[in-house]
């Protein structure tokens, strides 16, 4: 069975594992999911990620990050642009998540970028995939 929205599936798996205080979460891998994991690691929301060979295809395993008292590094994840309703942002109107405390993940012509990275590159807007805070 094909998956309609792999990014939403990834975010749901992360959200569920995070709320259950799991140390790792696994899912089918793709280039888009790998790039989202790279962004989450660079922004400090996850500890690490790795791709492993599975019986069919590849598997993406993400190590979640917790504080010294088991506080979650990810407070929330929200899918914005969905298959039924795409959401786009111009370079002049990029979203701000929680007044700059969170990030928006954008799919641009320059690849996947955060809203801060897209703001630094003049004239880059794109599809708003998700908010992370």
UniProtKB/Swiss-Prot annotation:
Example GO CC term: the record gives: ribosome
Q: What InterPro entries does the record tag this protein with? A: Ribosomal_uS8 (IPR000630), Ribosomal_uS8_CS (IPR047863), Ribosomal_uS8_sf (IPR035987)
SUPFAM superfamilies according to UniProt:
Ribosomal protein S8
A GO biological process of this protein is: translation
Query: Which GO molecular function annotations are given, in alphabetical order?
Result: rRNA binding; structural constituent of ribosome
Pfam name, any one: Ribosomal_S8
Keyword Hydrolase (UniProt): no
Q: Which PANTHER family does the protein's record reference?
A: 40S RIBOSOMAL PROTEIN S15A
Give the family from UniProt.
Answer: Belongs to the universal ribosomal protein uS8 family.
Quaternary data: Part of the 30S ribosomal subunit. Contacts proteins S5 and S12.
Q: What does this protein do?
A: One of the primary rRNA binding proteins, it binds directly to 16S rRNA central domain where it helps coordinate assembly of the platform of the 30S subunit.
Q: What is this protein called?
A: Small ribosomal subunit protein uS8
């Amino acid at each position: 069975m094909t998956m309609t929205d792999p990014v939403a599936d990834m975010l749901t798996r992360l959200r569920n594992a995070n709320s259950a205080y799991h140390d790792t979460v696994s899912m089918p891998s793709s280039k888009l999911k790998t790039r989202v994991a790279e962004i989450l690691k660079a922004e400090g929301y996850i500890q690490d990620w790795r791709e492993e060979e599975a019986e069919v295809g590849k598997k993406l395993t993400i190590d979640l990050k917790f504080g010294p008292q088991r506080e979650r590094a990810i407070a929330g994840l929200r899918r914005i642009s969905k298959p039924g309703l795409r959401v786009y942002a111009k370079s002049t109107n990029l979203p701000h998540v929680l007044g700059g405390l969170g990030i928006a993940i954008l799919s641009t012509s320059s690849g996947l970028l955060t809203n801060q990275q897209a703001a630094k590159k003049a004239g880059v807007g794109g599809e708003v995939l998700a908010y992370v805070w």
